């Protein structure tokens, strides 16, 4: 059983997945920092010194300056600023993944076209019915004519 697990774990796909998860986690941290430390402070500056990370509405009694004060007083809060930060974070990650997948698909389409060209070169028309057949065929599958050996 250990041997089977070892073979499974050492397959290329599992290792590729592990590397992808690690890089994805690191990328997520970078994007979160970008949103929280660069983008949202600039947006807040444009909106009149607003700090989105501390934007909230209390759902109970009391007036609090920060989310931490409200939570310490056990007053429920609607933290819309943190939600906006997370939405921007998600949009950046989703757009980045979209661009990466789009490039991968574009690369795969080019590869498929090359394979199709190679397949086209592997065919020839039947001299009797003109249907495309494999270039090494000795009999046409469409009209069943016997062909000359290649």
Swiss-Prot record:
Keywords: Cell membrane, Ion channel, Ion transport, Membrane, Transmembrane, Transmembrane helix, Transport. The chain crosses the membrane at residues 14-34, 81-101. Gene3D superfamilies: Large-conductance mechanosensitive channel, MscL, domain 1. It is found in: Cell membrane. It is a multi-pass membrane protein. GO terms for molecular function: mechanosensitive monoatomic ion channel activity. Channel that opens in response to stretch forces in the membrane lipid bilayer. May participate in the regulation of osmotic pressure changes within the cell. Belongs to the MscL family. PANTHER family: LARGE-CONDUCTANCE MECHANOSENSITIVE CHANNEL, MECHANOSENSITIVE CHANNEL MSCL. NCBIfam families: mscL, PRK00567.1-4, PRK13952.1. Homopentamer. This is Large-conductance mechanosensitive channel. It comes from Desulfitobacterium hafniense (strain Y51). The lineage of its organism: Bacteria, Bacillati, Bacillota, Clostridia, Eubacteriales.
């Amino acid at each position: 059983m250990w041997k089977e697990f070892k073979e499974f774990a050492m397959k290329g796909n599992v290792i590729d997945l592990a590397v992808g998860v690690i890089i994805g986690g690191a990328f997520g941290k970078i994007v979160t920092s970008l949103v929280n430390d660069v983008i949202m402070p600039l947006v807040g500056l444009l909106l009149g010194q607003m700090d989105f990370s501390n934007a909230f509405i209390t759902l109970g009694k009391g007036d609090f300056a920060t989310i931490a004060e409200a939570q310490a007083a056990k007053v429920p809060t609607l933290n819309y600023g943190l939600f906006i930060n997370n939405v921007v974070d998600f949009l950046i990650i989703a757009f980045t993944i979209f661009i990466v997948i789009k490039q991968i698909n574009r690369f795969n389409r080019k590869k498929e076209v090359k394979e199709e060209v190679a397949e086209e070169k592997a065919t020839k028309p039947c001299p009797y019915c003109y249907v495309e057949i494999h270039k090494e065929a000795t009999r046409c599958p469409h009209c069943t004519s016997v062909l000359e050996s290649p």
